[in-house]
């Protein structure tokens, strides 16, 4: 059996290891109950590091950034000063984002393009969202027309057979009249943005999200050019 002196030494050692709490005098008891009580607890350097890291918000380590595709799109889009635009037929203002390196679209040639009509931040009309005849899914269907021709003549064809299925030309996105002549001079692979006033666009009727009498932005990408028969 342990001696009384041994038990006394053990109790003294355990007491020395306990946290030391500062006493609160009777005068201090009148202070608000939510006052901070100081602890004097010996801790190691490793424990101090863990406590410090746990007190830092996670947002200090993880910064939410936009997806890479959104970042690329934001970098690629810029505000082009109006003075940098060129003036084309009918006084239309256009700017070539990419010049292209292929054949040139001339009057009478058949052009195949992708086009997007943007009103403010909305893409109102786009060949990249054309519909199949069944209307059950969207496909990217380039638009084909004759440069310099009367707008809409090619839309009178009933059907166009393409690798993606039977496609209704009459259900295709309706391009603005400006596209039929502003495409002239573009090279295959080129991308052009055009400021389209209502008289060269959708007039006083509007189209989809483009309101009546609105000016909008037309983006054209020239995919292919077939020269007129006499030039072959």
UniProtKB/Swiss-Prot annotation:
Keywords: Chloroplast, Isomerase, Plastid, Rotamase, Thylakoid, Transit peptide. It holds the Pfam family FKBP_C. Residues 108-226 form the PPIase FKBP-type domain. Its EC number is 5.2.1.8. It is an enzyme of class 5 (isomerase). PROSITE patterns: FKBP_PPIASE (PS50059). One of its GO terms (molecular function) is peptidyl-prolyl cis-trans isomerase activity. It is found in: Plastid, Chloroplast thylakoid lumen. InterPro entries: FKBP18-like, PPIase_dom_sf, PPIase_FKBP_dom. It catalyses: [protein]-peptidylproline (omega=180) = [protein]-peptidylproline (omega=0). It comes from the Eukaryota. GO terms for cellular component: chloroplast; chloroplast thylakoid lumen; nucleus; thylakoid lumen. PPIases accelerate the folding of proteins. It catalyzes the cis-trans isomerization of proline imidic peptide bonds in oligopeptides. Belongs to the FKBP-type PPIase family. This is Peptidyl-prolyl cis-trans isomerase FKBP18, chloroplastic.
């Amino acid at each position: 059996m342990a001696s009384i002196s041994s038990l006394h030494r053990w109790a003294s050692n355990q007491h020395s290891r306990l946290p030391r709490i500062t006493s609160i005098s009777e005068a201090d008891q009148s202070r608000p109950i939510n006052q901070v009580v100081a602890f004097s607890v010996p801790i190691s350097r490793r424990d101090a590091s863990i406590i410090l890291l746990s007190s830092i918000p996670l947002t200090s380590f993880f910064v939410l950034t936009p997806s890479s595709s959104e970042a690329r799109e934001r970098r690629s889009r810029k505000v082009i000063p109006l003075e940098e635009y060129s003036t084309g037929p009918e006084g239309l203002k256009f700017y070539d984002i990419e010049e292209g390196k292929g054949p040139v679209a001339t009057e009478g040639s058949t052009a195949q393009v992708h086009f997007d009509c943007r009103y403010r931040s909305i893409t109102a009309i786009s060949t990249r969202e054309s519909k199949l005849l069944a209307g059950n899914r969207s496909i990217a269907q380039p638009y084909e027309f004759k440069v310099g021709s009367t707008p809409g003549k090619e839309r009178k064809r009933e059907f166009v057979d393409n690798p993606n299925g039977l496609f209704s030309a009459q259900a295709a996105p309706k391009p603005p009249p400006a596209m039929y002549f502003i495409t002239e001079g573009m090279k295959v692979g080129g991308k052009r943005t055009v400021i389209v006033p209502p008289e060269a666009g959708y007039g006083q009727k509007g189209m989809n999200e483009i309101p009546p009498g609105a000016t909008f932005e037309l983006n054209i990408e020239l995919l292919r050019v077939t020269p007129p028969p006499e030039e072959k």
